Amino acid sequence: MRRRKAPVREVLGDPIYNNKVVTKFINKMMLDGKKSVSEKIIYAAFDKIEEKSGEKGIEVFEKALERVKPLVEVRSRRVGGATYQVPVEVRPARQQSLSIRWLLEATRKRNERTMIERLASELVDAANERGAAFKKKEDVHKMAEANKAFAHYRW
């Protein structure tokens, strides 16, 4: 384990919207250090969303992230030889990183032709409470609800 807690580094806002969450999404989507490719994809997806739905791409993005954020999750805890799935609340920073991760996983698994189309579709779906990322959040919440009896094992 670490001696000290790792310092949380501040990210700068992205070049167009000056939004830190968009920057985090761009960084998480980036493969092989190709940040410019990642930026092009996300901005093109925002344009595609505006084209399709008439809503601003950044607003749909923020709504999608908000809808995918988990409030509770389960953590494994061993008690006397048995492993229990204990429901715990999710801290805000983890809520954000999980929602970004789930949106990207769901986007990469979609069947549309280009990443731009996949990302745009997944963001619109998540904003409208459908899609794989939203389903993932619902599944996590169901697991926590099902294991509510073990909540007293929290740490």
From Swiss-Prot:
Keywords: Ribonucleoprotein, Ribosomal protein, RNA-binding, rRNA-binding, tRNA-binding. Disulfide bonds: none annotated. The keyword tRNA-binding applies. One of its GO terms (molecular function) is structural constituent of ribosome. Pfam families: Ribosomal_S7. It comes from the Bacteria. SUPFAM superfamilies: Ribosomal protein S7. InterPro entries: Ribosomal_uS7, Ribosomal_uS7_bac/org-type, Ribosomal_uS7_CS, Ribosomal_uS7_dom, Ribosomal_uS7_dom_sf. GO terms for biological process: translation. Coiled coil: none annotated. One of its GO terms (cellular component) is small ribosomal subunit. The keyword Zinc does not apply. NCBIfam families: rpsG_bact. Part of the 30S ribosomal subunit. Contacts proteins S9 and S11. Belongs to the universal ribosomal protein uS7 family. One of the primary rRNA binding proteins, it binds directly to 16S rRNA where it nucleates assembly of the head domain of the 30S subunit. Is located at the subunit interface close to the decoding center, probably blocks exit of the E-site tRNA. This is Small ribosomal subunit protein uS7. It comes from Helicobacter hepaticus (strain ATCC 51449 / 3B1). The gene is rpsG.
